[in-house]
């Protein structure tokens, strides 16, 4: 054990260098790597040193593009599950009675079925005790089927407790860190997504969704789900509490409550998570595949910074993405980046802008941000992300890259009005030189922000394929997002002359009175208050 902890201090990280990790990935057969584009071979070598590797035939990957289809598939997979259902989400919407009923019916129909749910404790109990919340919605499943069949866990950031928690408003508490993974597993299949489980994500909130029908990959994410669950509170019934539920710390958990001994908790959680982040179970069906079937390689990457020792953060997401972006060194390469909450990590932004590849950024227009026209402080959140987009455009201009890097705003109606949608998609796509379709994508929960790499728990996958159909489907996914995207440039932030009524003389005849000077105003959805400038400078890392 001493040697394990001494290793922490012998491998200190710096902001300027990306560390090399050791994994238990076997060396890829030369016949396999040679069948991919030559530019991808070095990427395989670099990612093999960071994250576990899975070979998944492209026929086992399905891309969904519509929230209604996502919901229908989710319900169908729950209904047909025989062994296990595991759902990791920020929260389950307090009105999702149909989804809970679907899980209940699956449990009733199959006595061998086990259900495991992981949400965030702060977000999942925000409305309690006055109103319904995720916890009050879920507790009837435990009451009816027992905690031996329904294991509901709620992760609480270890870095918020005591006076800080009691004095800070509930919604502000959530800025200290959340369980942000979105893993939806059913037997030997899993959906990776950026979507949570609430009605807007099932109807009119655009996101991304990949369905993998692969047992080994599903088992890996199930292991991640279980590990974080074993560092979380368990939701149980309570006849004494007005809410009908309580959160308790099981003795079977892998460490003590963080509020009791934070140092020990971080030590135990680091010890638990390191082998999962770096290794995979060696038992593998890949050797049964013909070389012709090996057309897609997947690297699961996760960011668990709040649970890891600060001197040895062995999270794999940030390091893998920065390695991947070092590949953008050719004008013949294309990349696409999207985030509904646009506040790009500076190191990611630097690599995207500094590379030679041409790029497209898609972000939410203010009227597609779920906080648009909301009450209180959150009213200014769309402005904050708009400011981040403006700063990005300024940096692109300063680097002389306006001809090859474009930013688009996604908008489909006005959120919270009839037929209005919001935008929550996040991801990255990259092509090889001289190809129009991407062959690499990242799917998962991360928004690629400073917050994602310091406060929240994130889980994603890097997908690299040579399959023509899967590449086409990746491009179709981009095209689907671009349908509602319009260019945003720095000129859009400039004041524009407003239409003036034709001057009328006292006698009522038009044109005889001298016209008023033109009135110049910035468009309503381009205005950014001074307070937002200050707030982003101070609190930008929480966005």
Question: At which residue positions do the language-model features occur?
Answer:
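Acidic, glycine-rich loop-and-beta core segments that form the ion-binding/anion-interacting portion
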Residues: 299, 312, 318-334, 352-356
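Extended catalytic-interface subdomain
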Residues: 166-170, 193, 222-275
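A short acidic, Gly/Pro-enriched loop at the edge of an enzyme's catalytic core
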Residues: 82
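PLD/PLD-like phosphodiesterase catalytic module centered on the HKD motif
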Residues: 2-79, 97-191, 195, 199-204, ...
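Active-site cores of enzymes that catalyze phosphoryl transfer or operate on phosphate-rich substrates
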Residues: 28-68, 248-320
